[in-house]
């Protein structure tokens, strides 16, 4: 059996019982205290939900704006023409176009965190379904990424709006900021994220909806959160 390093031993000492349930603020403070990476680690939340996303009436998906932002520079591409294209550029879009943007993406240039389109451009965007779909980038009117108000959508994407979607096992993951953020900023983002998930509870969900909540950092341990400390828990 391999020997534990000093850092690993210190981690075990600080964590103690790995079955412990933490208050949200306590978990945030501990993960910041335990950070060891040279880069600015992300704070990540995971929620186990009482849903089976194989059933259409139990799908959980939507958008939420994190009040403290994400700490990431999100690249945004917009399919639009004319005044809408100019508005998207003015709002900070990284790439705006029509057929030319289609060809660029078909060539493999897909380094974007969000793709937005005006409704009249969906005939073009639809040809990218097999490319954008698997990456979760296909514009969707339900998520506000197919909209005539592209400027507002670009500002939202750049201003801390993130998408959430439940996975097969009923789990939702989300990055809610960087460990360099203040404790208060991270708590505000946590509350906003969880609140959005609670509000997105599908009609087909049976029994207890919010079953487990965990917090972790990019290189740190996962901490279980006391549901009594969580809004909607």
UniProtKB/Swiss-Prot annotation:
Q: Which UniProt keywords apply?
A: Repressor, Ribonucleoprotein, Ribosomal protein, RNA-binding, rRNA-binding, Translation regulation, tRNA-binding
Q: Which GO terms describe its molecular function?
A: rRNA binding; structural constituent of ribosome; tRNA binding
InterPro entries reported for this sequence: Ribosom_uL1_bac-type, Ribosomal_uL1, Ribosomal_uL1-like, Ribosomal_uL1/biogenesis, Ribosomal_uL1_3-a/b-sand, Ribosomal_uL1_CS
Instruction: Choose any GO biological process term that the UniProt entry carries and state it.
Output: regulation of translation
Instruction: Cite a GO CC annotation.
Output: cytosolic large ribosomal subunit
Keyword Glycosyltransferase attached: no
Q: Does the keyword Ribonucleoprotein apply?
A: yes
Q: Name one Pfam family in it.
A: Ribosomal_L1
What subunit structure does UniProt give? Part of the 50S ribosomal subunit.
NCBIfam families registered for this protein in UniProt: rplA_bact
The UniProt similarity line reads: Belongs to the universal ribosomal protein uL1 family.
What is the purpose of this protein? Binds directly to 23S rRNA. The L1 stalk is quite mobile in the ribosome, and is involved in E site tRNA release. Protein L1 is also a translational repressor protein, it controls the translation of the L11 operon by binding to its mRNA.
Q: What is this protein called?
A: Large ribosomal subunit protein uL1
Q: Which organism is it from?
A: Novosphingobium aromaticivorans (strain ATCC 700278 / DSM 12444 / CCUG 56034 / CIP 105152 / NBRC 16084 / F199)
